[in-house]
Amino acid sequence: MTTNSNTQRLYWVDLLRLVAMLMVIAAHCVDIYNATPQDDPMNSFWGVFIGSLMRPSVPLFAMMTGLLLLPIRESAAEFYKRRIPRVLIPMVLWSAVYYLIPWLTGVAGLDKSVITTLFPFEFSPSQEAGDALKNIGLIPFTFNGYTTHMWYLYMLIGLYLLMPFFSAWVEKRDSTMTNTYLLLWLCSLTLPYLKQLIAPNLFGECAWNEFGTFYYFAGFAGYLLLGHILARRHHMPLRRIIAMGVMLYISGYIITYTGYASMAVQYSYEEAPELLELFWQFCSPNVVLMALGIFLVAQRINITSPRLQSLLAATTRCSFGTYLMHYIFIGPVILLLTPLGMPTPLCVMASVIIVFGICWSLTALIYKALPRAARYIVG
């Protein structure tokens, strides 16, 4: 993993990518506790507690993308040709696999209720082959509860499409314009909250116009720019950086946890997911604080052990494949661990380790067995 301006590998970024990947798996391991009502209230508590801890995962990925790829040193056509197929083709392939699983449970004679365990956010499960084929046909356009995590790949392709244009502006190195953009982006992060406090349509939004004043500065592009800016190491003392990072993360977490917990009392995923996840939105001030805290501390980690460097490099190579397939294994692993009676936090931790180990091993095996085709299977 290298930057465009420096061929030296950034091992702290490899470590950060590993942390973000484990956070994604942990977040999805607690889906089963958050998506549906729990008989044990402690399961609900741990679902919210752990889920809130993991919200910076996707923003961290976006920040690393900006750090590593901006500014782009190739033509837009070359960038698109090299980057987009390695996301789009595996996304289509694995989405099809996910959509076939419910049908396969029916073929195997399993009860439909098992689908809800495997895919907690699919509230209308079906074992019909026709529904599976319909979902596969819609892959280029949308996703559903069977492929919850694939939303990120649609978003990532959008960032890739934007980056050549974004890069041309970033290369000008105009600090005033950069700071202004970030300020407007920060304003856009408050919109979900303002829509609940003031009115659902703000700054020109209405039935015939969904593009309000701050629309053009909103979304994950701000994380790209933030990662690019933070690529330059700051000379603040390490102790102060750690203190600042911890403070940012904890303050953001308090808002994220208390906000979600208060919403969970009033709403459910099936009734109003947009309200329930109001404080869990990735593009929100509180999650930015959490991501920024982790990023600043990770940036100061110096990894000198050749063995650890090699391990992190191998882990990074398999990270995209791990992301693609991890959701398949979470449900079965939790089903196997639940009868053991482990405390919920321990069950989640064990699930994360097992799922990551399985996915990493399978991805590494695909790279070894199919070296030429692997890039189109696991990225």
Model-found features: residue ranges?
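Alpha-helical transmembrane segments and their immediate juxtamembrane cytosolic regions
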Residues: M1-G379
